[in-house]
């Protein structure tokens, strides 16, 4: 069983912002596998389904980004999911737009949502899909809560689809295979 968590902030004002990429990827997976994310529990919205023979729980925490660990630990404990089977998808400023990076473990890298998840799990050993949003020329908060330009949106739509495929690959083939397949790929206009 896998817990697939997309990080983001709830509310219309955050829809399609850089910081909500995790929500967008979870929505793509939900659509592909006909999973309705309409149940409220674990301080978030979630749905249950299958990828092949594996049961998956798709989770969108409603705690706001910096407290995402509260939602993740509640769902993981309820379903008794191993940390190695918790996949977290989130935006990453240290990666260029058009790229993603799959990792099996690691530090928070300055991302407060990941920092909170690491604290609650008491471990940094869980797979993650880091989606590049590029470096801001402006205030970081305004940048991550801002929307993509038209040109960026064209690239991001393709990266979101690739990120969903990377999550599916982790479930079907394992994190190492997903890393080999998706790390280093760059999508351009």
Swiss-Prot record:
NCBIfam families (alphabetical): pth
Site (Stabilizes the basic form of H active site to accept a proton): residue numbering on this chain: 91
Keyword S-adenosyl-L-methionine recorded: no
Keyword Membrane in annotation: no
Official protein name in the record: Peptidyl-tRNA hydrolase
Reaction catalyzed: an N-acyl-L-alpha-aminoacyl-tRNA + H2O = an N-acyl-L-amino acid + a tRNA + H(+)
GO BP terms: protein quality control for misfolded or incompletely synthesized proteins; rescue of stalled ribosome
HAMAP family in the record: Pept_tRNA_hydro_bact
Site note Discriminates between blocked and unblocked aminoacyl-tRNA, residues: 9
Organism for this UniProt entry: Clostridium botulinum (strain Hall / ATCC 3502 / NCTC 13319 / Type A)
Family statement drawn from the similarity comment of this UniProt entry: Belongs to the PTH family.
């Amino acid at each position: 069983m896998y817990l697939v968590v997309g990080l983001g902030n709830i509310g219309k004002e955050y829809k399609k912002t850089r910081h909500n990429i995790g929500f967008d990827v979870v929505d793509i997976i939900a659509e592909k596998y006909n999973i309705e994310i309409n149940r409220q529990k674990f301080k978030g919205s979630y749905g249950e389904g299958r990828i092949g023979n594996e049961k998956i729980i798709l989770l969108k925490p409603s705690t706001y980004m910096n407290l995402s660990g509260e939602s993740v630990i509640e769902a993981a404990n309820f379903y008794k999911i191993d940390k190695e089977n918790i996949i977290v998808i989130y935006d990453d400023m240290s990666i260029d737009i058009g790229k993603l990076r799959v990792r099996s473990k690691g530090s928070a890298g300055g991302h407060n949502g990941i920092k909170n998840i690491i604290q609650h799990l008491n471990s940094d050993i869980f797979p993650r899909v880091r989606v590049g949003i590029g470096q801001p020329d402006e205030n970081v908060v305004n940048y991550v809560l801002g929307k993509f330009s038209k040109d960026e949106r064209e690239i991001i739509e393709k990266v979101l689809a690739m990120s969903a495929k990377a999550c599916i690959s982790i479930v079907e083939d394992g994190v190492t295979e997903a890393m080999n397949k998706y790390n280093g790929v760059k999508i351009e206009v």
